[in-house]
């Protein structure tokens, strides 16, 4: 066997699995379809498509994967570190009513069960509250007051190292065992890729320590198939087939392992397992695969400001929020000064209706 465990995907689930397995002494390989970025490799603006967007068939090998469906457009991460390289650093704990959902409420006391793991994740990811007030926060406060909801205004818990802006210091989180860090400069480009080194991506914590413990992270490895070796239940191990994604078929590999962790995100995991089920490679996969898949219930709305002098970008990606009712949570979001390439994906916000009638509303 090449490894005791192969982890498919290097995002939040994959990085955590890789670290904990490596800490137990297993040999661990991590497969990631995207490339590996150093801080200075990230795009300087969203217009640098080759470093920002993920579409390898077009030669684009950036961090943002856009996946269209009939009624929704999904944004997800690509690259070593998965979603952590492109997300907005925010770390809210689920509200109590989430744990009361009938799909899982009777299975365990989830709020109690997850309290410890929440605390561990917050410590590992360096979660703290945004320590400043930005122009966007003031606008949101005014809007909340106009609705009588000013008491719901709160700053955001984020995985960002603030320190002294632009100043690089020895690791402040793990008694010096982690990488050097640089203080946030409030450029607002967290979701474009943090070129400063202030964003606590998984490369700064879970993956950093997983590699220190011996895990091998292999970038540019798109998994195409998983097959059991010998017994169909996988008790004899697995063969994982990969190829380098790109315009032309890249180098293909076969890697063996005693166990597999599939953690390729909600889209990637379901797509890979469905392909393996339908091809017969993993014929024992449940027919319920893909049911109850959920988004994170967010919609991104664009607002054009008439006055550019407000410097709404001078912040982290998401710095504050309000609740206008029990189910509606509004945040102020920025992509920074050079983050407007996605504006052409937006259109006018209309009321309810059909696909045809809304055009004229």
Predicted regions and their residues:
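Active-site acidic short loop of glycosyltransferases
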Residues: 2-3, 257
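Conserved redox-cofactor binding core of oxidoreductases
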Residues: 109-222
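Short, hinge-like loop/turn segments at secondary-structure boundaries
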Residues: 46-49, 172
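Glycine-rich loop(s) and the adjacent beta-strand/alpha-helix scaffold that form part
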Residues: 23, 34-39, 44, 196, ...
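N-terminal Rossmann-like FAD-binding beta1-loop-alpha1 element of flavoenzymes
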Residues: 5-30
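Redox-cofactor-proximal catalytic regions of oxidoreductases
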Residues: 49-132
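A short alpha-helix-loop-beta-strand transition element characteristic
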Residues: 65-72, 77, 127-131, 149-161, ...
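FAD cofactor-binding and catalytic pocket of flavoenzymes
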Residues: 62, 68, 83, 87, ...
């Amino acid at each position: 066997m090449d490894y005791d465990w192969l982890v498919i995907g290097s995002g939040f689930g994959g990085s955590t699995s890789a670290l904990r397995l490596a800490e137990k002494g297993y040999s661990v390989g991590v497969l990631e379809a995207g490339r590996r970025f150093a801080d200075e490799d990230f795009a300087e603006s969203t217009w640098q498509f080759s470093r920002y967007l993920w579409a390898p068939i077009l030669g684009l090998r950036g961090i943002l994967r856009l996946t269209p469906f009939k009624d929704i457009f999904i944004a997800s991460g690509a690259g070593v570190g998965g979603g952590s390289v492109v997300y907005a650093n925010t770390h809210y704990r689920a509200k109590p009513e989430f744990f009361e959902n009938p799909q899982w409420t009777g299975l365990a006391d989830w709020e109690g069960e997850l309290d410890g793991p929440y605390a561990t994740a917050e410590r590992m990811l360096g979660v703290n509250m945004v320590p400043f007030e930005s122009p966007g926060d003031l606008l949101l406060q005014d809007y909340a007051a106009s609705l009588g909801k000013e008491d719901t205004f709160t700053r955001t818990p984020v995985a960002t190292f603030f320190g002294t802006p632009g100043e690089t210091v020895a690791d402040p989180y793990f008694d010096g065992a982690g990488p050097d860090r640089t203080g946030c400069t409030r450029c607002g480009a967290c979701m474009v890729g943090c070129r400063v080194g202030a964003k606590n991506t998984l490369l700064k914590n879970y993956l950093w320590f997983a590699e220190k413990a011996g895990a091998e992270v292999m970038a540019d490895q798109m998994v195409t198939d998983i097959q059991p070796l010998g017994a169909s239940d996988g008790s004899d191990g697995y063969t994982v087939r990969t190829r380098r994604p790109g315009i032309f078929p890249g180098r293909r590999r076969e890697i063996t392992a005693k166990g597999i962790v599939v953690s390729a995100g909600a889209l990637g995991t379901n797509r890979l397992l469905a392909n393996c089920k339908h091809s017969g490679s993993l014929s024992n996969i449940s027919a319920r695969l893909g049911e109850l898949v959920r988004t994170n219930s967010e919609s991104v709305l664009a607002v054009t400001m008439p006055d550019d002098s407000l410097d709404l970008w001078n912040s982290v990606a998401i710095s504050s929020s309000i609740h206008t009712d029990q189910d509606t949570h509004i945040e102020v979001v920025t992509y920074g000064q050079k983050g407007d390439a996605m504006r052409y994906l937006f259109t006018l916000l209309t009321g309810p209706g059909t696909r045809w009638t809304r055009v004229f509303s």
